[in-house]
Curated annotation (Swiss-Prot):
A single MF term (Gene Ontology): lyase activity
Organismal lineage: Eukaryota, Viridiplantae, Streptophyta, Embryophyta, Tracheophyta
Region (Disordered): 1-40
Keyword Protein biosynthesis part of the UniProt annotation: no
Gene designation per UniProt: CpNIFS3
Protein name as it appears in the record: Probable L-cysteine desulfhydrase, chloroplastic
Domain of life: Eukaryota
Organism the protein comes from: Arabidopsis thaliana (Mouse-ear cress)
Subunit and partners: Interacts in vitro with QS.
Biased composition (Low complexity): 22-32
Length: 475
């Protein structure tokens, strides 16, 4: 599909977004010859590798050549991506286990997982290695924290009716976990209603203060605040540092930050954020194979971390959460073992992971503004409140009027136009006239190109010209 940029603009765009690290003998695909023997200190002590050049655009294409070339894949936020070189190293780890499982289990698994934890600890600026546990995903991490909350209610450490405060836009599975662990144990749940579209961070801060006051009503004590770092749908970067400070001033016992879209997408610094618990997937924006995440548990948290346990109980029960999480029975641990190699992969890009975040943010804003201009709509939040994802309003004339409509439209775009894109339904407010009720969430990752977004632009414009309505789509 022809680009809407002029040749000089196109050349400038690709120059800005493909300045990366070289593929030299130390690239991830050749590192360690499949044995992954380098010590963790080799990676964490050298945040930047001193190569004269950066990975080229053709090398990036090769790393992601397993992606279906017929699709505009602009939904990295849902499932992430993993480069071919890391997938090859993952396969090496899988074969090492299958080749001699006894030696792998007794001699290699725990120290290599410990290496991965050390990499994560330094990336997130945690104080101690044992504050970091590696788990399957952010959903598992939420279950660990909420399980502790449930036990506190059941054992009488929390009074029945004490509150857990969470954002209305919390991820669906986390809401279900709150229902399963907190509500069933006698806790009171307060949801903070957030606006969308969002005009400023102050709106969110003000609404959060109101939500906390509601949680504390009738003499209740707020035992846990559950705050997203980047909400999923709609996607907005939450001012978590400010919200954590408010929680401290208001006497909230513990703060848990759900950052499924954290590492590789936004700045993640445990000492600056100051939360008791923080979780982030590594397979969404840090190029890990699915699935792997970390759970940070601050040692000085109220109630300590000794009563945090993995929900899958193994013979490691009672040895600390980090050790419990390192063995939950026979399974494939390879996604956890390639973390040091992923750090080396991202350091092939100019600026490492920070450079990737910056370029992804700039690119997704640029593409979002291009779509807004073409469709005559608006962004869902100011550019500074998005990371590597941004919400873009769809033309009102498409007639998006329900959750069913957005699901059908998403399927239609995938099957007819080969575009992978999530869509959000925003119910109209009272008195609104012709509001935008449908928003697409576009992501930008290193493998994306402007033509991916041009395909979406042109598909929607074509539907508008044809008088398309969501009501025309069958179930």
């Amino acid at each position: 599909m022809a680009s809407s940029l002029s040749p000089p603009e196109e050349a400038s765009y690709h120059h800005r977004h493909t300045k990366r690290y070289t593929s030299s003998a130390s690239s991830a695909s050749s590192t360690t010859n499949g044995t992954v023997e380098s010590s963790v200190s080799d990676f964490v002590k050298r945040p930047k590798i001193s190569h004269p050049n950066y990975i080229s655009s053709s090398e990036i294409e090769s790393e992601f050549s397993h992606h279906d070339p017929d699709f505009a894949r602009i939904n990295n936020g849902s499932f992430g991506c993993c480069p071919s070189s890391i997938l090859a190293l993952q396969r090496d780890w899988q074969l090492r286990f299958l080749r001699q499982p006894d030696r792998f289990y007794f001699d290699e698994l725990k120290p290599k997982i410990s290496d991965s934890r050390s990499v994560i600890k330094r990336l997130i600026n945690a104080e101690h290695d044992d504050e970091v546990s590696i788990v399957d995903n952010a959903t598992t991490a939420a279950a660990i924290v909420l399980q502790q909350t449930a036990w506190a209610f059941r054992e009488g450490r929390f009074d029945k009716g004490d509150a857990v405060v969470m954002l209305h836009y919390a991820y669906g599975s986390v809401k279900k976990s709150v229902e399963a662990y907190v509500t069933r144990s006698g806790g009171h749940v307060t949801e903070v209603q957030l606006p969308f579209p969002v005009i400023s961070a102050d709106e969110i801060i003000d609404r959060f203060r109101i939500g906390l006051e509601s949680g504390k009503a009738n003499g209740r004590r707020v035992r846990l605040a559950l705050i997203d770092h980047v909400t999923s749908m709609p996607s907005v970067v939450i001012p978590i540092k400010e919200l954590v400070k408010i929680c401290r001033r208001e006497g909230v016992d513990q703060v848990f930050v759900d950052a499924a879209h954290g590492i590789g997408c936004v700045d993640v610094d445990m000492k600056e954020i100051g939360a008791d618990f923080y979780t982030s997937n590594l397979h969404k924006w840090f190029f890990a194979p699915p699935s792997v995440a970390f759970l940070y548990c601050r040692k000085s948290s109220n109630g300590g971390v000794a009563d945090l346990h993995h929900p899958v109980v193994s013979n490691e029960y009672g040895n600390g959460l980090a050790v419990e999480s390192s063995w939950v029975g026979t399974r494939d641990y390879s996604a956890q073992l390639v973390v040091p190699s992923i750090l080396e992969f991202v350091n092939r890009f100019e600026g490492g992971i920070d450079g990737i975040k910056k370029r992804n943010h700039e690119s997704v804003v640029e593409m979002g503004q291009m779509l807004v201009k073409s469709w005559g709509t608006q962004l869902g939040c100011p550019p500074e409140m998005c990371a590597s994802m941004i919400m873009v309003g769809l033309p009102v004339c498409l007639g998006v009027s329900s959750e069913s409509d957005v699901l059908k439209l998403r399927t239609f775009l995938r099957e007819k136009f080969r575009i992978e894109i999530p869509i959000y339904f925003r119910p109209p407010g009272d008195g609104e006239i012709d509001p935008i009720t449908g928003y697409v969430r576009i992501s930008f990752q290193v493998y994306n190109k402007p033509e991916d977004y041009h395909r979406l632009r042109d598909a929607i414009n074509g539907l508008v010209r044809d008088g398309f309505k969501c009501t025309s789509l069958s179930c």
